[in-house]
């Protein structure tokens, strides 16, 4: 199979929760970062909420009690960033937020067969995810499982070549919004239509489930991913998402 390595398509998980503990004061959860049990992962369950300074201090205290050396946030909208910056968090990544209407969607001609991605396939999906996104941004089995169950309606699909999974997509719908939550393609097989086929399948499913808007995010400087989404009618919103980190092992 002719394949060429291209830059990884890093995508965070809009609309998902990758965590294990629920804080009482606000809707947020704290877990661990994939492959880094010493790094706390904080996710706001309501993307539009603005935490207070006291909320942020409480989360820092929780992470410190759990022995974390750092705490990282999930993707934050601009309005939620202020209290974190005031507490000493710094920016570690910026994500472009893209959307497109789904009132109508005409599926493209299928070039490859898209198959269900089941739990027994997660180990293969993890391999692809880490190879595409690297050890810092790649998901482990638990994180991918969380993504599959993060929305009321979920859709996980893969493409297989010679009995080997070479790409997968995880999609969810909540209300009238569809989220392309994770898209990963083996670096050796990128730019051969695998990602495009998976995006097409995801959008068709969102439309079938009644979503009127589709959303996805990716690294703000990831030109290949931005170009791919542009071909599907996604347009970049004015607001970007950011991920923040606070080192706890250097704080007094």
Locate the predicted segments by residue.
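Conserved GNAT acetyl-CoA-binding A-motif
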Residues: 63-76, 206-218
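Conserved active-site tyrosine of GNAT-family acetyltransferases
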Residues: 84, 89, 229-230, 234
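Helix-loop element at the rim of GNAT/NAT acetyltransferase active sites that forms part
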Residues: 127-139
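Conserved donor-binding loop and adjoining core beta-sheet/short helix segment
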Residues: 2-64, 169-181, 186
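A conserved beta-strand-loop-helix scaffold within acyl/acetyltransferase catalytic domains
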Residues: 32-33, 138-162, 166-184
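Conserved beta-strand-loop-alpha-helix junction that forms the acyl-donor binding cleft
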Residues: 72-80, 216-226, 242-249
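A short beta-loop-alpha structural element at the N-terminal edge
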Residues: 113-125
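Conserved acetyl-CoA-binding loop-helix of GNAT-fold acetyltransferases
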Residues: 50-61, 185, 191-204, 208, ...
